[in-house]
């Protein structure tokens, strides 16, 4: 194990673990899939060598909670039953000489919608109770279906861990700690690792045969320079040029608008609290001024003075709502915005490539 003073620099995930996460997430989609990660910490690099899913918790059919199955699946990593299950699994892995150090957990996401209270509580549980040097792997099923694997690693920042432990997300505390929504997560780079034997095998796989007949090469030089002769299974293909714009981009825009509406709702609630607080403070100030005038009169008449702190019993100041939900929602808005920006930048070149076919009356240059 590496020294704890050395910070984590990257997360290295075995290809087999990636395939397990993809398979589990795809099978349970759109329900949230969660599981445990095991591996080791080697000189600041967290090596994930194995993974296993958490069992599905059965929810009574007459449950009165909305979205109870989804909530139970998202909260599975910190459930007591799954904690016992995880301990037993790690014990069995140790018996067969497999890396049995808990290094975190994984979860699936849809359209980047993973910044919520469940992932915060799960990761806080892992970093506080199990191992401080643990990560949360987030696999976006919808984003990966567009042709590029979406697998990201996150940890809670020490600054947010301290604030979440106190559970005081008021405006005053946030200003004192200088905690912003950008400081919630610390993202680590993810590296996919293959053994040398597997890499050699992939490069030796034969390419698929061409669909049409090919002319025989006239010479040895022509055969050597033929791109089909040197191509392999790992060569980029034309599938990356597909224009799959509408499903992903439209859904992201809809979810971005929903998050912005939620932000306005949270903002209105906080403004209502400020107005209520101002009204109560005005009443308290008027009461205190009246009590001081009464005490001045009683002092002239040499009568006992009345208590001036009695307003604490007569008036009750409204409690400030927690700013945690607002911070998480703002972080989610940033997540959607980055996704839309990245997707649009990747498709802009494709759109220019087919511009002549999309706009009638224009000819290609």
Swiss-Prot record:
One of its GO terms (cellular component) is eukaryotic 48S preinitiation complex. Residues 11-160 form the MPN domain. One of its GO terms (biological process) is formation of cytoplasmic translation initiation complex. Keywords: Coiled coil, Cytoplasm, Initiation factor, Protein biosynthesis. Pfam families: eIF3h_C, JAB. Its main location: cytoplasm. PROSITE patterns: MPN. Component of the eukaryotic translation initiation factor 3 (eIF-3) complex. Component of the eukaryotic translation initiation factor 3 (eIF-3) complex, which is involved in protein synthesis of a specialized repertoire of mRNAs and, together with other initiation factors, stimulates binding of mRNA and methionyl-tRNAi to the 40S ribosome. The eIF-3 complex specifically targets and initiates translation of a subset of mRNAs involved in cell proliferation. Belongs to the eIF-3 subunit H family. This is Eukaryotic translation initiation factor 3 subunit H. It comes from Coccidioides immitis (strain RS).
